[in-house]
Amino acid sequence: MPSKPSIPSEPSGPSKPSGLVAVSRALARRAGGLRFGPPTAFVYNPLVYARASHEAYLTRYGEPGAGTPRGRVLLLGMNPGPFGMAQTGVPFGDVAMVRDFLGVSAPVGRPPREHPARPVRGFECPRGEVSGTRLWGWARERFGTPQAFFQRFFVINYCPLVFMEARGQNRTPDKLPATEQAPLFAACDRALVEMAAVLAPALVVGVGAFAATRAELALGPSGVPVASILHPSPANPRANTGWAPIIEGQLRALGMAL
């Protein structure tokens, strides 16, 4: 049977969401309506079950305002990791970093179907995410506070869904068949264009080659410049030799003063 993430319903109330939250909810609906076949066996949609913490992150640090200007650098990841955003709803969302550095914490629900080896425990998840520890750890060491970091940068993921095979192996979007990629990437491209319209980034930096390629394809007509930096995944041998100094060199090569 094809796997399908959950589709959220809009809460009742007098006001409708706007800005980044509206884009996020629309993406959750579009991506949540798609089906994925074997070897994908489980699909998690943290924009639905971790909506509270995800939207807290968007509104606190993303929406342009007095403390979060337009024209920042947008760091774009690929998709949620099983022990990061899948648990917390925040990109590169290592539990300790999200809770203790970003100050974001909220009740997290559960996807309709969970792999028994990959349960969603929200902020009670005992495992850390190396990529998130590296990215947010760099932000903390370099900038000191979230406010100082988010004056310069914002972080999102291109795709909101987590894909797992029957044995619990993580499956990244680039491994999906073309027939499944096409509608998914169309939804993600649209959301990225809409996010860029809200944020007006001076530069989009793909965290890894996949994200940079998708950003170039989605944002090319708008003229937003796109670059890339090394992904912090421990599966990347080069990242294990000292990710932070490597990406600082890459960012400086792009003309950024750190």
Where do the PLM segments sit?
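Ser/Thr/Pro-rich low-complexity tandem-repeat tracts
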Residues: 3-18
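Flexible loop residues that form catalytic
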Residues: 209
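Extended hydrophobic/aromatic segments used for targeting, binding, or gating
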Residues: 217-242
